[in-house]
């Protein structure tokens, strides 16, 4: 019996070597594009709608510039500093990633070429810088931002990416679990953004007191792109179209929905009104919290993580922030400390608690090395579970230290050449002073509702001063002052 001929389109060829999985390559390119769309146009229009009208162009342009600048630097030197051969214990050797021979080789993970991996990792690096921008909107000198982006990418992002994600990184070898960037992207951007906001200084007092979004519907459109784009963000990190990719996507959306609802319920309980801005904040904290765990935890754990991510960052933002002199001093425009640093740290710790050994073996290919404390106790491997929690905590401390130090040094270096902050006169004007352009051909800042009682419209950090009371199961009163 003669053999059935193999379809010609599936035969190996110069453009399709035997090691290449066309399905995995196609999904990886699509996942990268989804992540890219989270930034362009997702965060561009989210920032453009969330800020005061006079800052819409500047906020959007900071994001667009960062995306382009990161891409340029990434292919010239930054990718191989993050994932290449070891230069120092925490760093890879800088080198071009543009040569055909290098681009067509199989990537260090996955059945696709280096070119695909470079693209995928680039959009992750780009969104990290754009998230940092959220902390300094409304006053950072654009020329300082133009310098900040390549410097921070080179001397901070590559450092943490190599240590945590590279196969040669010391935390990767120890066994840290950061499935899709809770540490490398979100904790880094939250800490770096808060640190940069400290050095740049605050917005004008009147802008800090009243900073209403100029277009809530536009902000919601950006938030929707951000949420749906997370399908590629977490679904692309198994580097294949397998079972763990499906689980990661489902867990991502389950956690996010739970977090959003939790945040909205807390707003209703304590502020008596559901807030659109609050819902977006809850959405973001849910997305961030599940990121380090998406493909390595069970669905029920994702729901629990959503409850935590919708409540703990809410409490730190609405209560602790207002009572802390340090937190009040630093003007973090988009609250990235809470939505990214705290939510990312929370996700990392909960990953150390709920990481399921079988799911980790699907992702890492190693069984019983990555064991959450919850399962470690069940399996009589409590010491392994405690070790995992310890590694997760060590990763948090490492990322905080690296980003505080590197971001501070970069800001101090930049201000030797250009001011970090715009002048008071230019901040009064906004986009017209910074770029000679305006977003809308209308007068005023859209501040018609001066008596608005939204807890988010006047300032992102309002104290919970009007106590809301609810009865607990025993009939006593629970108050939040």
From Swiss-Prot:
Pfam families per the UniProt record, alphabetical: Ammonium_transp
Taxonomy of the source species: Eukaryota, Viridiplantae, Streptophyta, Embryophyta, Tracheophyta
GO annotation, biological process: ammonium transmembrane transport; response to symbiotic fungus
Organism: Medicago truncatula
InterPro entries: Ammonium/urea_transptr, Ammonium_transpt, Ammonium_transpt_CS, NH4_transpt_AmtB-like_dom, RhesusRHD
GO cellular-component term (any): plasma membrane
UniProt protein name: Ammonium transporter 2 member 5
Principal place of residence: membrane
Family listed: Belongs to the ammonia transporter channel (TC 1.A.11.2) family.
Stretch forming the signal peptide: none
Coiled coil: none
Gene that specifies this protein: AMT2-5
Cytoplasmic side: 50-58, 138-141, 202-215, 272-275, 321-333, 415-481
């Amino acid at each position: 019996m003669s053999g059935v001929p193999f379809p010609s389109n599936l035969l190996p060829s110069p453009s399709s070597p035997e090691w290449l999985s066309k399905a995995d390559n196609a999904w990886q390119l699509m996942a990268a594009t989804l992540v890219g769309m989270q930034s362009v146009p997702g965060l561009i229009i989210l920032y453009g709608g969330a800020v005061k009208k006079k800052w819409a162009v500047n906020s959007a342009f900071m994001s667009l510039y960062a995306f382009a600048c990161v891409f340029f630097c990434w292919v010239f030197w930054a990718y191989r500093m993050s994932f290449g051969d070891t230069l120092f214990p925490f760093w890879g050797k800088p080198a071009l990633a543009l040569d055909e021979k290098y681009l067509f080789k199989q990537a260090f993970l996955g059945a696709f070429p280096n070119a695909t991996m470079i693209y995928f990792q680039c959009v992750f690096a780009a969104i990290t810088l754009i998230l940092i921008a959220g902390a300094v909107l409304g006053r950072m000198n654009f020329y300082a931002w133009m310098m900040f982006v390549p410097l921070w990418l080179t001397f901070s992002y590559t450092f943490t990416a190599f240590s945590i994600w590279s196969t040669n990184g010391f935390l990767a070898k120890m066994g840290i679990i950061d499935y899709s960037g809770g540490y490398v992207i979100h904790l880094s951007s939250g800490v770096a953004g808060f640190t940069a906001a400290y050095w740049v200084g605050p917005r004008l007092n009147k802008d800090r007191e009243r900073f209403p979004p100029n277009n809530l519907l536009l902000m919601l459109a950006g938030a929707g792109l951000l949420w749906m784009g997370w399908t590629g963000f977490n679904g692309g990190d198994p580097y294949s179209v397998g079972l763990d990719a499906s689980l990661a996507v489902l867990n991502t959306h389950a956690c996010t929905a739970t977090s959003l609802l939790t945040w909205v319920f807390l707003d209703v309980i304590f502020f008596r009104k559901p807030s659109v801005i609050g819902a977006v904040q809850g959405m973001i904290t849910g997305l961030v919290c599940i990121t380090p765990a998406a493909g390595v935890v069970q669905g029920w754990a994702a729901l629990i993580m959503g409850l935590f991510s919708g409540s703990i960052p809410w409490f730190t933002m609405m209560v602790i922030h207002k009572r802390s002199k340090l937190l009040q001093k630093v003007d973090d425009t988009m609250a990235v400390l809470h939505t990214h640093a705290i939510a990312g740290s929370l996700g990392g710790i909960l990953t150390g608690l709920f990481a399921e050994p079988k799911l980790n073996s699907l992702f890492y290919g190693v069984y019983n090395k990555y064991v959450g404390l919850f399962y470690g106790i069940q399996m009589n491997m409590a010491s392994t579970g405690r070790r995992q929690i310890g590694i997760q905590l060590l990763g948090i401390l490492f990322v905080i230290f690296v980003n505080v130090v590197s971001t501070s040094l970069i800001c101090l270096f930049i201000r030797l050449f250009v001011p970090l902050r715009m002048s008071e006169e230019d901040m009064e004007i906004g986009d017209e002073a910074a770029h000679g352009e305006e977003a809308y051909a209308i007068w005023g800042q859209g501040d018609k509702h001066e008596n608005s009682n939204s807890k988010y419209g006047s300032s992102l950090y309002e104290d919970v001063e009007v106590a809301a009371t609810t009865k607990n199961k025993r009939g006593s009163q629970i108050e939040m002052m």
